[in-house]
């Protein structure tokens, strides 16, 4: 498997001007090939026509060949059945912020939105050997949303929605506007060999470095039997995140450069919803800092406070549910601030006195198993409501819902030689194989 360099975002280059003698939509049997119109013209109508002609026929192919760049100037739903969408080129989203804010598809979570929905069944989306894919034109969004978290209107470029038995592979997503990929209300989806890079070049956006919030690699939501393999993520936010009602998930061979790593959450934000994350395996993950951002954690779990305080996307809480039957194996750490932790006092209303609610969550974490975790932590102070924590492992569970049946085996996390504090913190947690509070 060949991946782009982890220290360079690369250059999205491609031909956006088509020869005038070449028709923009060519059909040969059940194969439809789209050539871009060029000159900034919208290629969505021709792509959708190709999908209608060849993407809903058994064995059909829709081909967007390299090295072309296709302008995506409007929201797009590609409904595929028993067919293939081959993206050798690059889908470049337009810079019309007003259009996207007002016209993107709405997502039933944190008032979010998406620009491209992929729906259907028994389909393949393939970027080919050169890893074609998406350029989200993200920098203009990073600058536009600076100073805010979860700013309304930033659309996700790839939204797998109401799909079954599908494979997405060999895709590169550069400069996503928001989360790069959302798998939502879908089942039996395989996502293999992805490269995601979100790099901020505007120093006024983030004083911490060349990263920006809400540029996750992939999030799962209300989905079952999802496989994520052979990913490289470089950005600064969650590489992989499991949102509510993500079940039977397998993640393997993921390399992360910068950010919080693998996230279970956030969960329990909505008081009228039950969030379940169950039967999850995370295996063979490597995490280390990037030039964009430090490596905040390797794997972490986050649930909202137990009272409904404020409104989503940055406020809320009081939701119910559980994370259960989780296995994290073969996690390699390099220069990680807080390698493993559980946080049950989540809120993004940073100016409010949230600490008073830190033991109110009834969200449950149980049957979590960690094996073969090694590398080094930095023991740098990490802010947590009401305290500063600096450990290899911190299990900060709620008094109302203690964490139970947690096991740790073959854990070897070294901290700096001049560090004299505790290595492990356990609050309201039962952890076998871990020297709690030592």
Curated annotation (Swiss-Prot):
Provide the residues annotated with a glycan attachment (glycosylation).
28, 102, 111, 197, 245, 253, 279, 325, 353, 372, 388, 418
Q: What induces the gene encoding this protein? A: By rhamnose.
Query: Repeat PbH1: residue ranges?
Result: 186-222, 223-244, 246-266, 277-303, 323-344
Q: Which GO terms describe its molecular function?
A: galacturan 1,4-alpha-galacturonidase activity; polygalacturonase activity
Any one Gene Ontology BP term = pectin catabolic process
- UniProt signal peptide: 1-21
Question: Which function does this protein serve?
Answer: Specific in hydrolyzing the terminal glycosidic bond of polygalacturonic acid and oligogalacturonates.
Q: What is this protein called?
A: Putative galacturan 1,4-alpha-galacturonidase A
Taxonomic classification: Eukaryota, Fungi, Dikarya, Ascomycota, Pezizomycotina
């Amino acid at each position: 498997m060949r991946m782009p360099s982890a220290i360079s975002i690369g250059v999205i280059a491609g031909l956006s001007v088509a020869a005038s003698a070449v028709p923009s939509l060519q059909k040969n049997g059940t194969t439809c090939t789209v050539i871009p119109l060029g000159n900034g013209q919208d290629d969505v109508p021709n792509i959708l026509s190709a999908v209608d002609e060849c993407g809903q026929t058994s064995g059909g192919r829709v081909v967007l060949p390299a090295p072309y760049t296709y302008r995506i100037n409007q929201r797009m739903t590609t409904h595929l059945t028993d067919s293939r969408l081959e993206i050798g080129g690059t889908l470049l989203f337009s810079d019309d912020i007003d259009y996207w804010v007002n016209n993107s598809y709405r997502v039933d979570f944190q008032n979010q939105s998406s620009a491209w929905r992929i729906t259907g069944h028994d389909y393949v989306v393939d970027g080919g050997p050169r890893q074609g894919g998406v350029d989200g034109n993200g920098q203009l969004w990073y600058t536009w949303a600076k100073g805010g978290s979860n700013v309304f209107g930033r659309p996700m470029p790839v939204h797998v929605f109401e799909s079954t038995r599908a494979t997405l592979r060999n895709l590169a997503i550069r400069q996503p506007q928001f989360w790069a990929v959302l798998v939502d209300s879908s089942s039996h989806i395989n996502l293999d060999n992805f490269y995601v890079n979100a790099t901020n070049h505007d120093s006024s956006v983030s004083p911490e470095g060349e990263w920006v919030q809400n540029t996750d690699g992939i999030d799962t939501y209300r989905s079952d039997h999802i496989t994520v393999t052979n990913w490289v993520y470089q950005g600064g936010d969650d590489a992989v995140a499991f949102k509510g009602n993500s079940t039977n998930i397998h993640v393997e061979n993921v390399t992360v450069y910068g950010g919080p790593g693998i996230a279970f959450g956030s969960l329990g934000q909505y008081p009228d919803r039950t969030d379940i994350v169950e039967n999850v395996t995370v295996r063979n993950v490597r995490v280390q800092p990037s030039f964009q951002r430090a490596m905040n954690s390797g794997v972490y779990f986050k649930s909202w406070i137990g009272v409904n305080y404020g409104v989503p996307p940055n406020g809320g809480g009081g939701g119910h549910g559980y994370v259960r039957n989780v296995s994290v194996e073969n996690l390699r750490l390099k220069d990680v601030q807080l390698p493993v932790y559980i946080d049950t006092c989540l809120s993004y209303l940073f100016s409010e006195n949230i600490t008073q609610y830190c033991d109110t969550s009834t969200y449950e974490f149980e049957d979590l198993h960690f094996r073969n975790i090694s590398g080094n932590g930095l023991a740098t102070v990490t802010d947590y409501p009401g305290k500063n924590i600096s450990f290899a492992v911190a299990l900060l569970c709620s008094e109302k819902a203690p964490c139970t049946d947690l096991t740790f085996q073959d854990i070897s996390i070294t901290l700096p030689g001049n560090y004299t504090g505790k290595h492990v913190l356990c609050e309201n947690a039962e952890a076998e194989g871990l020297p709690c509070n030592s």
